[in-house]
Amino acid sequence: DTDRSRGLGDVYKRQDCRKGPGGMREEYERDLHHAWMILETDELYKEDYQMRMLMENAIPGLLSVRGQGKDDKSQYRYEISGKISVKAKGEKEHWKFADLENFMRQFIQVLYAVKNYLLNVNCLSLDPGHIYVSDEIYYFCYCPGLEGNILEKFHELTEYFVRETDYEQKEAVYLAYELHKASMEENYNICLLYTSPSPRDRSV
């Protein structure tokens, strides 16, 4: 048996690769006790202010990350043990109002946390495959090599919510469409999207 001749780490380690947003390469590693998401960009790795801040602080709502250079590229390794991606969550069950409300509340808290640590909110990935959840707590991926505008990324995320919302729950549909509608306005403010009354308090 070929597997029996390998070490336990090799037997249980599995790697899956795919192309991510913005041309990033994604790789996933798992063993008996841990799981990691690895993002690779074409930029030369730099141990800059962002990486020092990420590695020296447990920033609320962000996945823990370690960075390294490899073949003139940058690799960012995220600890995802015990968590599932938002994409996987949506494949199991449609998004309900409480799920969307909880997500938005935590997302806005993360935006403020990122700003408080003088990091760039545009480096947050809002790809459903890069956002993780465990016990209803969401963890976001901050990637220094990621390009793009956070407003455009959020607009794409709202399109995902519109597709994956539970259409049997009227208030969930209302919230998903309201977020999507707001994200199409010019120069909108994400952090102000949740200052309006809850759909529970409105006639739907």
Say what each PLM segment does:
Residues 115-134:
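Catalytic-loop of the protein kinase fold
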Residues 74-76, 131, 138-139:
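Hydrophobic residues embedded in beta-strands of well-ordered beta-sheets
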Residues 134-193:
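C-lobe/activation-segment region of protein kinase-like
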Residues 22-34, 44-45, 57:
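ATP-binding glycine-rich phosphate-binding loop
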Residues 41-45, 50-100:
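Conserved structural core of kinase catalytic domains
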